[in-house]
Amino acid sequence: MLHYCRSRAFGYIRILELEGVKKGSLTAALDRIVGDIKDSDGVVIDIRNNPGGDDSTAITIINRFCDRKRVAFHRKTKIGPGEDAFTKRKTWHIEPQGDAQFTGPIVLLTCDSVFSGGEAFALAIKQLPHAFGLTLRRR
């Protein structure tokens, strides 16, 4: 699900999917990754071709890159065929969690083949003032 590497100055994190990971193993992986990259000059987070998964997994990851609590996004879910058949609006927040956060510059790599929880990840990380995104076309 998560792969990372680091040069002297920069970290690179590849998020393959946001589904099927246990919270304990995700927390341990994030502790290791953020601990290793926390003094980097910048980090590239790559979610290209991510099939998605749980919004809560996306938020858990982004929380390790937050400097303070912020609104991530609002969501309604379609629940039926009618034009107005949606759940009530739910507000999702991002906020610092874990032993360490990385709050330096972040570049998000995404493309037109990112879905579901991957889209939520992209929406939420855009709320961080130290993050910006690059959308790449698939060939």
Please state what every model-predicted region is.
Residues 17-19, 49-51, 112, 137-138:
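A mature extracytoplasmic/lumenal domain signature
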Residues 27-34, 58-62, 103-106, 118-122, ...:
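Extracytoplasmic/secreted envelope proteins and their assembly/folding machinery
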Residues 13-14, 36-52, 109:
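Short acidic catalytic loops
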Residues 1-24:
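Short beta-strand/loop segment at the start of cytosolic alpha/beta domains
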Residues 21-41:
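A short, well-ordered alpha-helical element
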